[in-house]
UniProtKB/Swiss-Prot annotation:
Gene from which the chain derives: lipA
Enzyme class: transferase
Lineage: Bacteria, Bacillati, Actinomycetota, Actinomycetes, Mycobacteriales
Coiled-coil spans in chain: none
Organism: Corynebacterium kroppenstedtii (strain DSM 44385 / JCM 11950 / CIP 105744 / CCUG 35717)
Family classification: Belongs to the radical SAM superfamily. Lipoyl synthase family.
Protein name: Lipoyl synthase
CDD domains (UniProt xref): Radical_SAM
Length: 347
């Protein structure tokens, strides 16, 4: 019987994944830590108040850039997800009871850090009657109440696609409602067995119909083809998705889905251009782009592309929106030059 380091019996899919060693990364997957004044101030505030962000706890490679923009991400609902996706490092199982004071604490953390834009994400809570809908909505309400000049992006699970639960979340009116599709139909069931491709598209559609700015993410390198990625992008756009991020899959451990290929920066540039061609208001694509990467700036870019004005209380998000982010594929091409094909191999 195969077991994990903590003594837990491995799932069959984990045992199969573990047969493939962790892969060596290509040269373009790297970051440079630049500690500017805003980053240093945020780090001091976070440490002084004993606060915790996903940015730190997940060891995000983009923390220096996002914190310099006064942006951060918070994980809500506990540290245990009621579903398991084959790419995700969050543990799955039966979650702890809901902490109803969490929304207030998160809002106070946002105020203490002095964020300009905050992303809220969290685990799936199928164990709760409302699947956590109240929690996701209440965090947005509390942040807006205590931080009227802070934008909020709400990255949520699908709430089983139930209109009444989604309505609860929509009515909190985040600046951006995000739900990540993540992959293409052919491999969706293996990668996200507890989710449904069409249901995720319908979540985006319902948010669009409510009048929210919508966002999603695609992870590449798990076995999809170029044509399948383009088709998924069209599906998202047809569902009413406004903003899209496209990223490279990085394997959290050998128990997770093996990396099928390293997507070159040139291909990410192609997806960015294709996304704009088919009508996305904002597209960010690159190997180390993540769904919350430079989220405030991407929101501001999307509002501008739609020919709209940022709300008066969020005008500050429009500063420097035309600058290229360091993890965008076009920046990597300028820095490293054309990419050679890099086969996937053990490190």
């Amino acid at each position: 019987m195969a077991v994990a380091p903590n003594g837990r019996r491995l799932l069959r899919i984990e045992a199969r994944n573990a047969q493939t060693p962790i892969e060596a990364k290509p040269r373009w997957i790297r970051t440079t830590a630049t500690m500017g004044p805003e980053f240093r101030d945020m780090k001091k505030r976070v440490k002084g108040a004993g606060l915790h962000t996903v940015c730190q706890e997940a060891g995000c490679p983009n923390i220096h850039e996002c914190w310099e923009d006064r942006e951060a991400t918070f994980l809500i609902g506990g540290d245990t997800c009621s579903r398991r996706c084959d790419f995700c490092d969050i543990k799955s199982g039966r979650p702890e009871p809901l902490d109803e004071d969490e929304p207030r604490r998160v809002a106070e953390n946002v105020r203490e850090i002095g964020l300009r834009y905050s992303t809220i994400t969290g685990v799936t809570r199928d164990d709760l009657p409302d699947e956590g809908a109240w929690l996701y909505a209440e965090v947005v309400r509390q942040i807006h109440k205590l931080n009227p000049n802070t934008g909020v992006e709400n990255l949520t699970p699908d709430f089983s696609g139930k209109p009444d639960l989604l309505q609860t979340v929509f009515e909190a009116r985040p600046e951006v409602f995000a739900h990540n599709l993540e992959t293409v139909p052919r491999i969706f069931k293996r990668i996200r067995p507890a989710f449904r491709y069409e249901r995720s598209l319908d979540v985006i559609r319902q948010a669009r119909d409510f009048g929210l700015v919508t966002k999603s993410n695609l992870i590449l390198g798990m076995g999809e083809t170029v044509d399948e990625v383009k088709s998924a992008m069209r599906d998202l756009r047809d569902a009413g998705c406004d903003i899209l991020t496209v990223t490279q899959y990085l394997r959290p451990s050998n128990l997770h889905h093996p990396i099928e290929r390293w997507v070159k920066p040139e291909e990410f540039v192609m997806y960015r251009d294709y996304g704009h061609d088919i009508g996305f208001a904002g597209v960010m694509a690159g190997p180390l782009v993540r769904s919350s990467y430079r989220a405030g700036r991407l929101y501001a870019q999307a509002i501008k592309a739609r020919g709209e004005e940022l709300p008066a209380n969020l005008q500050h998000l429009g500063e420097g929106i035309d600058d290229t982010a360091s993890q965008e594929a076009s920046t990597l091409l300028s820095k490293y030059g054309a990419s050679r094909e890099t086969p996937v191999g053990a490190r």
